[in-house]
C-alpha cells in the first residue's frame, strides 16, 4: 500500500485537502439538505396551490355578493320611490281633506244662519 492509500485519496478544496471519505460525507450531507429543501418547496407549493384555490373561490363568492348587493340596492331604491309616491299621495289627500273641512265649515255656518238654535 502506498502513501495515497493511507490518506484515502486526497482532494484539493478551498479550505485545504480533504479525504475522499470526508468529501463523500460532505456531498451526502449537502444532498440530504437539498432533498429537505426540495421536499419543503414541494409542500409549500401544494399549500400555495390550495391557498390560490381558496382565494379564487372567495373571489367568486365576493362577486356573487356584489351582484346580490346590487340587486338589493335596486330593490331599496324602488321601495324608496314607492314611499315617496305614497307620501305625495298622502299629502294630496291631506290637502283634499283640508278643503273638505273648510267646505263643511262653510256649510255649517250657513246652516246656523238658516236655522237659528232654539
Curated annotation (Swiss-Prot):
InterPro entries per the UniProt record, alphabetical: DUF16 (IPR002862)
Pfam families: DUF16
Highest taxon of the lineage: Bacteria
Family: Belongs to the UPF0134 family.
Name listed for the protein in its UniProt record: UPF0134 protein MPN_287
Annotated source species: Mycoplasma pneumoniae (strain ATCC 29342 / M129 / Subtype 1)
Phylogenetic placement of the source organism: Bacteria, Bacillati, Mycoplasmatota, Mycoplasmoidales, Mycoplasmoidaceae
Amino acid at each position: 500500500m502506498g502513501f495515497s492509500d493511507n490518506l484515502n485519496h486526497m482532494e484539493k478544496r478551498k479550505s485545504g485537502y480533504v479525504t475522499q471519505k470526508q468529501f463523500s460525507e460532505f456531498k451526502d450531507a449537502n444532498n440530504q439538505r437539498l432533498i429537505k429543501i426540495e421536499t419543503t418547496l414541494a409542500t409549500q407549493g401544494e399549500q400555495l396551490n390550495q391557498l390560490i384555490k381558496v382565494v379564487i373561490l372567495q373571489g367568486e363568492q365576493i362577486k356573487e355578493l356584489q351582484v346580490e348587493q346590487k340587486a338589493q340596492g335596486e330593490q331599496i331604491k324602488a321601495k324608496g320611490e314607492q314611499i315617496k309616491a305614497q307620501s305625495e299621495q298622502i299629502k294630496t289627500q291631506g290637502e283634499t281633506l283640508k278643503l273638505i273641512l273648510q267646505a263643511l265649515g262653510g256649510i255649517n255656518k250657513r246652516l246656523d244662519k238658516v236655522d237659528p238654535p232654539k
